[in-house]
Amino acid sequence: MRRKKISIVGAGNVGATCAHWIAAKELGDIVLLDVAEGVPQGKALDLMEAAPVEGFDCMITGTNDYRDTAGSDVAVITAGVARKPGMSRDDLVSINVKIVRQAAAEIARYSPDALIIVVTNPLDVMCYVAYKASGLPRGKVFGMSGILDGARFRTFVALELGISFEDVTTLVLGGHGDHMVPLVRYTYAGAIPVEKLIPADRLAELVQRTRQGGAEIVELLKTGSAYYAPGAAITQMLEAVLKDKKRILPCAAYLDGEYGHRDICAGVPTIVGAGGIERIIELELTAEEQAAFDRSVSAVRGVLKGLDI
């Protein structure tokens, strides 16, 4: 039986960590691509040499040539300049838009049936760029955002309550940036509404920490941005696709009227399976939640304005 083929564009910390998770879960063969000669080849070889120890069986290939990605089932775009202290995700747009545009076009050229998962920041803008550059149907190009943001909020809630991380569920909507919308109303600890367990003022602090979650790690690392949690979040999306799990996952999706917005990418709850985003779930938001979502989408539009797309 043919193994699934997963191509990762960008062999930096996020791409390499994602490859590690994919290999450990045996989701398929991996192609690790980067412009830096020797880097993807070295990381691929290093990871493959862990196979006899860890007991996974998959081929991992490093390359500088998009032709080696031909026939991919899924491609993940992580390539781009990483954040440094003091930078917002939006500060990366002028550099990363060129990288993502080329990557999406090359993926579509060599793997016209592939799904594309975008990870490069600013995420929602890059997801839109990739969608337009690829020419693929909207459900086949989507971004990793709410899973990571939700994981951060879940972590902070679990630590606050002293409970298992697994027992906290939540939903984060909107852009993957400072205006993201963690929905406290949809946050539960072991099926108990978290509003019953944590005072409102403390919950507001945890929401704000979630919005600044990426920046907090950037400030601590000083040389780059997060990669363990992003790698795990990407892998959860890949598993949903490759195993056709029909998972309900918050993803950056191209909106065509959903939640009152068109021609923009933003984080919304979706059903993810073999077809990519197979359905966008529209929730009835409160007036306050809708206003926050609208502000978040407006921030994404503001970054998109002026780009040649």
Swiss-Prot record:
What keywords would UniProt list here? NAD, Oxidoreductase, Tricarboxylic acid cycle
- List, alphabetically, the NCBIfam families matched: MalateDH_bact (TIGR01763), PRK06223.1 (NF004863)
Question: Where are the catalytic residues?
Answer: 176 (proton acceptor)
Q: Which GO terms describe its molecular function?
A: L-lactate dehydrogenase activity; L-malate dehydrogenase (NAD+) activity
Output the InterPro entries linked to this UniProt entry.
L-lactate/malate_DH (IPR001557), Lactate/malate_DH_C (IPR022383), Lactate/malate_DH_N (IPR001236), Lactate_DH/Glyco_Ohase_4_C (IPR015955), Malate_DH_type3 (IPR011275), NAD(P)-bd_dom_sf (IPR036291)
Described by its record, this protein's role is as follows: Catalyzes the reversible oxidation of malate to oxaloacetate.
The family note in this entry says: Belongs to the LDH/MDH superfamily. MDH type 3 family.
Report what the protein is called.
Malate dehydrogenase
The EC number(s) given in the record are: 1.1.1.37
GO BP field:
lactate metabolic process; tricarboxylic acid cycle
Where, in this chain's numbering, is substrate bound? 83, 89, 121, 152
Q: Which reaction does it catalyse?
A: (S)-malate + NAD(+) = oxaloacetate + NADH + H(+)
Which HAMAP family would you find in this protein's record?
Malate_dehydrog_3 (MF_00487)
Classification lineage? Bacteria, Bacillati, Bacillota, Clostridia, Thermoanaerobacterales
Q: What residue range is the signal peptide?
A: none
Where does the record place a coiled coil?
A: none
Name the PANTHER family for this protein: L-2-HYDROXYCARBOXYLATE DEHYDROGENASE (NAD(P)(+)), L-LACTATE DEHYDROGENASE
Chain sites annotated for binding NAD(+)? 10-15, 34, 96, 119-121
Question: Where does the source fall among the domains of life?
Answer: Bacteria
Which Gene3D superfamilies does the protein's record reference? Answer: Lactate dehydrogenase/glycoside hydrolase, family 4, C-terminal, NAD(P)-binding Rossmann-like Domain
